[in-house]
From Swiss-Prot:
Residues 1-17 form the signal peptide. It comes from the Eukaryota. GO terms for cellular component: extracellular region. It comes from Lachancea cidri. The active site is at 148 (nucleophile), 208 (proton donor). This is Alpha-galactosidase.
Amino acid sequence: MFPFFFALFFSSTDVLAASPSYNGLGLTPQMGWDNWNSFGCSVKEELLLGTAEKIVKLGLKDLGYNYIILDDCWSSGRSSNGSLLADDSKFPHGMKYVAEQLHNSQLKFGMYSSAGEYTCAGYAGSLGYEDMDAATFASWDVDYLKYDNCYNKGEFGTPEISYKRYKAMSDALNKTGRPIFYSLCNWGQDLTFYWGSAISNSWRMSGDVYPQFDRPDSRCPCSGDEYDCSYPGFHCSIMNILNKAAPMGQNAAPGGWNDLDMLEVGVGNMSDSEEVAHFSMWAIVKSPLIIGADIDDLKDSSLSVYSNPAVIAINQDVLGTPATRIWKYHVSDKDQYGEGEIQLWSGPLDNGDHVVALLNGGNNERSMNASWNDIFIDYLADSDELSNTWGLYDLWARRMSNATAASILSGNMTSAGLNYNVTQLNYTAGIARNDSRLFGDRVVELSKGESLTATVPGHGVALFRLRPE
């Protein structure tokens, strides 16, 4: 979240990135649900536990969505000894009870604070209280901390200053002895992608997302590839954030991930093609997959998007290499906001497979193609590492039907046996066993020197897994 009052200037210097997996957590991007984008400060015990129950019933937990993250506005301040207090009018049984209930459902409990005097909504922040607050979170059996950047008392302006402020909580969490996933939410300020992996498991890299595919907004002033944005803002569109993330993939790896912010699938009024593109692109760049929607008000088509194991398997691939944007071109069929571009993204996967996305940000459906040399741009044309023939699998071809999703949402059909269950067979093992649910449909064979061609809807994507044959 973005502060209400924020200094406008800072300078930056380079900081060397450290090795990933600083605490052994986050070897694949985190998945789960956070209440903020749909509920804001309207939080209470029933919301968290009711949502958790629904996530289990809908089969989302089985797919890997296992963190239930309580965002801002949960606190009633500090006790006489300085420790954080939960608001007992919202959480009458206390936070340890919430954690226990989630753990009983094989889910994990996430909480929120800010590296400032106050949180973004004006509640007690953790700046200067890091050791005490980390100990409190650990005593509540918390598994995850989202750590924001509001009211930071001007402690920013260079990577070193921001690093030290966020490292204080990192060290405090580690002192507790409890494994706690550490998620930075400092909006990419002070080049977080250079130093985030040294002290955390993920880091936001832009201003806050909102559910618009590419609508410009003055509150998100940086655009294009302006990854080093001095005023990150908020109300950033899907394409705005994706373009900022394009050069940052080289800084992500198992243990530390670029966080493009919560998923807006099921939030607002994006089209189905836009939601598919949003989910696909977050998945292939290895962003965390954190649902931001109201699970009780989820559309059938949105549940279908969230429930695609073939796409999730790309995100959870243990190689952990984000796809790279190979090219971007502006097109003439611009939308109502004057925006329109097409892109090719490509990247390697753990078992020798490859992922390719043709992204159509234009207003109209179009035929798009990618050359062999573009897809495999990181290999020499005659490389022995490359197979001469690849099977091409459409990762959305076996998407759950809207009718099935509607039946699951209504309770007329159980998700048991329909969804992939990562608790029984993880994605790596499923790929090794050629589980068809993780591949979609084989649509064509791609031979050396040929181009991949697909028809892509406006504001949509064609997403493929390539397998050497």
